[in-house]
Amino acid sequence: MKVAVVSIGSFDTQYSDYHIMRDIILGLLERGHEVNLIQKQYLETPQYPQQFEKYLKGQLQVQNIRFEKKAKADLKARYLADLSYYKQACTLMKKDKPDKIFLQSNNTAFFTVFYAKHILRCPILYNEQDIFPENAFFAGILSESSPVYKVAHALQKYAYKNATALSTISDDMKSTIVTRYSIP
């Protein structure tokens, strides 16, 4: 089976989910699946975990999308940059025609879920690890009455309801999604 794995980060850097993504990809490869990893590229020369070496150019194809990090305080620029990245990822998946898609947690998931469902007509597993905008609400950055919160909440709800499957990293996160988004 051909599985597209769309990462929020890059193996160029040790981001917070590095080990989880590495292990998911290795698990798929060890079970005989072909994996097309789509990831951001921050450095001039892409880097990968050593465990990937025996699979590169065989079962594992990697497509790097150049990405420039935006200032952490510039939420709008970061959101638009991520949306551009996922648009490019969807274009790559349209060419590759995966059998299934694994989408890592991100703030613009609605776009990739919509594209997978309606354009590619491909099953998509959305792996939620950081519930946006709930994380901003719980941190006191956004209020539930703000337009930004309402729009972001509606877009994430679309992603949750329309993904073929949804996975979370903890039971309390699952409970939050079920409760705050009315997802069965």
Regions found by a protein language model. Give the residues of each.
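Helix C-cap/helix->beta junction micro-motif
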Residues: R31, D96, I119-C122, N162
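An aromatic- and histidine-rich active-site surface loop
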Residues: T45, R78-Q88, P98-E134
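Helix-loop-beta element that forms the nucleotide-linked donor phosphate-binding surface
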Residues: N162, S167-T168, K174-P184
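Membrane-proximal helix-turn-helix segments that form the acceptor-binding/catalytic region
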Residues: C90, F110-I119, F132, S146-L166
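A conserved catalytic-core segment of Leloir-type glycosyltransferases
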Residues: L37-D96
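N-terminal subdomain of nucleotide-sugar transferases
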Residues: M1-Q50, K54
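Acceptor-binding helix/loop patch of EC 2.4 sugar-transfer enzymes
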Residues: I8, D12, F67-K76, D96, ...
